[in-house]
Every structure is written in structure tokens, then in C-alpha cells.
Amino acid sequence: IDRDQLNEAFWLGVGSPGSVAPAPGTIYSPGAEWNKKWGVLDLKQANDLLDKVGLSKKDSDGYRLRADGKGRLRLEMVTVGGQFVPYTQIGEMVKQQWKKIGIDVDIKELERNLAFTRDNNNENQLITWANDGSEVLFLFPRHALPVDAAESHMGMAYARWYASRGASGKKPDDAEMLRAFDLFRE
């Protein structure tokens, strides 16, 4: 994602493009390098990562093909209309940016309650939402780690597993996520 382009277009250049990490200057900041990690546009790295996970084949329009051979890889990005941030327009710009790496995106604007109900039912592939509050990780952890079974916008099955201490949901198979869960619980 070209966060600088988004910043210029939607925040008139006054934002601070970066990653989901507590802001520098807060006691929770893991260090300035984390505010840019995975948040800087690098088309070569993006293409290399997509190729590495088995998405190296493309159709005649340059879009990546699914690894299972069932045609073009197409993602649905849910946006919430009528909010304080123009999520749908941001989604459209990201769609154009991802075209450069061969990712096809359908933008689907939904009413907020429906979008969040779909989130809770683990029915969204992607959803756009604000990242406000991530500078205080313990107040708004859901922006960085799926620990809130009611309001995480990512990994709801993982959030349910974490919140229920393994009684429901799905245990992540990623060791780093499990370690992050352990550290957060401490």
C-alpha cells in the first residue's frame, strides 16, 4: 500500500504513514523502526512474497491466479459508508495500487452494523477501519492483535480462541502469534 499517496489524497499530507504499532514517544513504543516495518511501499518485496506463497502465475491482464487453479485471485474489501473517514474511496485507491502487483479487489460498501456482523461471523476477507488508539495498546489491542472476541476486525476465530482460553475458536498455528498472545496476557 502506498501510504504516502493515501496521506496526500485523504489527509492533505498531515498524517504520519506507517504500520500498526504504538507511536514513537509513548512508553509502549517498541522502537521507531516498528512504525515503518511492513508499512513502506516496496513493490519488489510484495511481488516476491506473493510469488513465494504460490501466487506466481498471472492471467493475460496481469492479475494473479489462484494457487488451486480456480481462476483469478479476487479479494473482497468491505468498506463502511457514511463514516468520518472516506473508507470506500480509500479502498478504491488501494484497489488501484494492488493492481500493480496483480491483486484484483472488489470493493463492497456496507452499512456499519452489517459490516461488523459479518466481521463477528468471520465472513469478511478484508475490512477497512480506523487504527486510532493503537498508541495505547492495552486500551485498544484489537488494532494490532486479535484478542477482542467482540470487536477485533481480524482473525475472529483466533480472538475467540484467545478470549475463551482455548474453549472455542481456532488456535493459531503461527508460533509468533501464540507468543504475542502469551505476552499480551502477561
Predicted regions: what they are:
Residues 127-141:
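Ligand-binding clamshell of periplasmic/extracellular solute-binding protein-like
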Residues 93-97, 103-104, 121-129:
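Alpha-to-beta junction loops
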Residues 1, 14, 26, 79-83, ...:
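Short, flexible loop/turn elements at secondary-structure junctions
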Residues 7-8, 12, 18-20, 39, ...:
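Extracytoplasmic/peripheral linker and loop segments enriched in polar/acidic and small residues
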Residues 56-74:
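Short helix/loop segment immediately N-terminal to the Walker
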Residues 2, 17-60, 81-89:
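Structural transition elements
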Residues 72-82, 105-106:
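Short, well-ordered beta-strand elements
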